């Protein structure tokens, strides 16, 4: 597994249980997990991972609102060049993405307690 694949899996993991925003949750959680692996992650890597997940049908983007309609599915990857001031754009896993997430990832770096597996390593390509 290379760095890009790892970031994609970590991002997918973050959007499997709820709609999540890049700047509110995804970036912070993935950066925290990546640090356990000895990596510093940039926000742009998260955005790239989300674009790839959407392109491959593993995730979708939504606009969420406290007013009807409460959620609006967006087509494709929205531009997220800057941090959102009002946190309107969220991401959620698709059925295909959930199937991937639930599959047995031998390359997932963490054990069931969230600790880095001693046999895990990142491929340098």
Where are these regions (language model features)?
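Generic signature of intrinsically disordered, low-complexity, basic-rich segments
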Residues: 47, 55-57, 81, 124-125
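Residue-level marker of positions within ordered structural domains that often coincide
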Residues: 16, 58, 102
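Short, amphipathic alpha-helical interaction segments positioned at domain boundaries
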Residues: 67-125
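Short amphipathic alpha-helical interface segments
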Residues: 1-44, 48, 55, 87
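Sequence-level detector for tyrosine residue identity
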Residues: 19, 62, 90-92
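Context-gated lysine
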Residues: 36, 60, 95-96
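A short, conserved structural fragment
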Residues: 54-68
